[in-house]
Amino acid sequence: FQVCHSLGGGTGSGMGTLLISKIREEYPDRMMLTFSVFPSPKVSDTVVEPYNATLSVHQLVENADVCMVLDNEALYDICFRTLKLTTPSFGDLNHLISATMSGVTCSLRFPGQLNSDLRKLAVILIPFPRLHFFMVGFAPLTSRGSQQYRSLSVPELTQQMWDSKNMMCAADPRHGRYLTASAMFREKMSTKDLDEQMINVQNKNSSYFVEWIPNNVKSTVCDIPPTGLKMASTFIGNSTSIQEMFRRVSEQFTAMFRRKAFLHWYTGEGMDEMEFTEAESNMNDLVSEYQQYQDATADEEEYYEDEEEEEAQGM
């Protein structure tokens, strides 16, 4: 199942997560993929965005298998900076999102590809079940009117794809480390070139990858490029820097919740303050988990394992 919803407004966050939990009850063994639009740091539509987002993340951590994080502000930035659009409309933002969605799901829709289903993708990208919030990127970035005419080389595509300015959520991957990542190229190309490129990227930026997950960048090839482009690539990264986003929402949440601002809207509909406290602590746990794995080193991992073994023997 794929669900597209926003976490700022009432319908996307409330109805969206309710739908997800009902589907989860009904079809517990099916994969649940969400494309979630998080509230932006500067552009705010409603006052209670932090509440809605925190309550939604609380649900998404439990009920979604894979969550692609999108962000209106990051999309606006891409439109301004990269596409040089002066007044981007929602149509332009949707164009970027649809390109990414098409890239993420291309291995499901076209026959004979590696990573041919969501489950396989999830296995590759999720080292710990709670940490399933991914940043997505797309290259080459084009506006709706001008599909690019020059074709890019594989190294250029790769470079554009890993560029932090291309990420569709407001977190900078350079502030954290990648646990895992996946790159999907859409063109007839040799996998050997591709793997070389990926190894290159990893060697150059080795400090941005955790060393305790070897071979953590997977690449796949799909022969059929998207309409109007000769080649394209989609990037999905599980980076610890996404905690910036959760931390920001959490701070806004705490600032409002401490004063119990606007709470009556929720309690009037039959919600309990306890649910808010729970959602807040779940979000904070998520942030600290990301931080823990960002700081973890290979030696520490071995140390933990030794401790666990000793405990097991002690029992």
From Swiss-Prot:
CDD domains reported for this sequence: beta_tubulin
KW Ubl conjugation (keyword) present: no
Residue spans of biased composition, Acidic residues class: 297-315
InterPro entries named in the record: Beta_tubulin (IPR002453), Tub_FtsZ_C (IPR008280), Tubulin (IPR000217), Tubulin/FtsZ-like_C (IPR037103), Tubulin/FtsZ_2-layer-sand-dom (IPR018316), Tubulin/FtsZ_GTPase_sf (IPR036525), Tubulin_C (IPR023123), Tubulin_CS (IPR017975)
GO MF terms, alphabetically ordered: GTP binding; GTPase activity; structural constituent of cytoskeleton
UniProt binding sites for GTP: S6, G10, T11, G12, N72, N94
Pfam family, one: Tubulin_C
Localization of this protein: Cytoplasm, Cytoskeleton
Record region (Disordered): 295-315
Entry's Gene Ontology cellular component terms: cytoplasm; microtubule
Cofactors (names): Mg(2+)
GO BP field: microtubule-based process
Record key words, sorted: Cytoplasm, Cytoskeleton, GTP-binding, Microtubule, Nucleotide-binding
Family: Belongs to the tubulin family.
Function comment: Tubulin is the major constituent of microtubules, a cylinder consisting of laterally associated linear protofilaments composed of alpha- and beta-tubulin heterodimers. Microtubules grow by the addition of GTP-tubulin dimers to the microtubule end, where a stabilizing cap forms. Below the cap, tubulin dimers are in GDP-bound state, owing to GTPase activity of alpha-tubulin.
Quaternary structure, from the entry: Dimer of alpha and beta chains. A typical microtubule is a hollow water-filled tube with an outer diameter of 25 nm and an inner diameter of 15 nM. Alpha-beta heterodimers associate head-to-tail to form protofilaments running lengthwise along the microtubule wall with the beta-tubulin subunit facing the microtubule plus end conferring a structural polarity. Microtubules usually have 13 protofilaments but different protofilament numbers can be found in some organisms and specialized cells.
Protein name: Tubulin beta-1 chain
Organism: Daucus carota
Gene field: TUBB1
